[in-house]
Amino acid sequence: MQLNESRAWTAFYAPGTPKDIEVPNGSLPDMLSEIAERFPDKPAIEFFGAQTTFAELQDQVLRFAQGLRRIGVKRGDRVALIMPNAPQHVVAFYAVLRLGAVVVEHNP
């Protein structure tokens, strides 16, 4: 799928930034798994001077998804996230998607 529709804001992109990108097929959790496998030691999240690698993020997502599954969250369920923009939010977001559930954002 190409995202190539003319958009005014692209005039403000830094030089060399592509205006068209190829969006791969697959889910976000599948993409995270692939990236974690290819680049396990690369930083995925930097937050207040602390780094989380892609391997660490993937591990946290899988463990949180397992916890959600244990309490009964399943495909199609809606899960509200009321969290600040912090690493824990990223983990929760991907864990919900990993189960096939739907994230319902309620950012404070």
What are these regions, as identified by a protein language model?
Residues 1-25:
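Flexible, non-catalytic linker and terminal segments flanking ANL/adenylate-forming cores
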Residues 22-24, 31-33, 41-94:
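Conserved AMP-binding/adenylate-forming core of the ANL superfamily
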Residues 97:
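Anion (oxyanion) recognition and catalysis
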Residues 100:
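Structured binding elements
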Residues 106-108:
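Short beta->alpha connector loops at strand-helix junctions that form conserved
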